[in-house]
Curated annotation (Swiss-Prot):
InterPro entries named among the record's database cross-references: RNA_pol_sigma_r3/r4-like, UPF0251, WH-like_DNA-bd_sf
SUPFAM superfamilies the UniProt entry points to: Sigma3 and sigma4 domains of RNA polymerase sigma factors
Disulfide bonds: none
UniProt organism field: Dehalococcoides mccartyi (strain ATCC BAA-2266 / KCTC 15142 / 195) (Dehalococcoides ethenogenes (strain 195))
Top-level taxonomic group: Bacteria
Family statement drawn from the similarity comment of this UniProt entry: Belongs to the UPF0251 family.
Protein name per the record: UPF0251 protein DET0218
Length: 117
């Protein structure tokens, strides 16, 4: 049985979720899909300039996982830009800031202050 998928933490949902080359009808374009977590990895590393270890900590993932996610995101963006493809940002398993994620239940012993269980 595979390990359960760990939710990634993001700070905001991208305001724009679709990019395409100008002047080409959408029906004629191939499309790359970038997950919301991949977009967050790009934002943290390339836009904010954080070190990978700090960016991974903010997303609640390991540094190797962050690096794989960043590589995948950069590949998809470069492929879309250089080959004239559309880019859709959607999907993924993530939590927005400190809101609960993935219907996962946290045992009361981990959320209650000491002496409150």
């Amino acid at each position: 049985m595979p390990r359960p998928y760990k939710c990634r933490r993001i700070s905001e949902i991208p305001k724009v979720a679709y990019y395409k080359p100008a002047g080409i009808p959408l029906s004629l374009l191939e499309e790359n899909q970038l997950s919301t977590e991949e977009a967050e990895a790009l934002r943290l590393k390339d836009l904010l300039g954080l070190e990978q270890a700090e960016a991974a900590r903010q997303m609640n993932i390991s540094r190797p996982t962050f690096q794989r996610m960043l590589y995948s995101a950069r590949y998809k963006v470069a492929d879309a830009l250089l080959k004239g493809k559309a880019l859709r940002i959607e999907g993924g398993v993530f939590e927005l800031d400190a809101r609960p994620c993935c219907q996962r239940q946290i045992p009361p012993s981990q959320t209650d202050p000491p002496g409150q269980t």
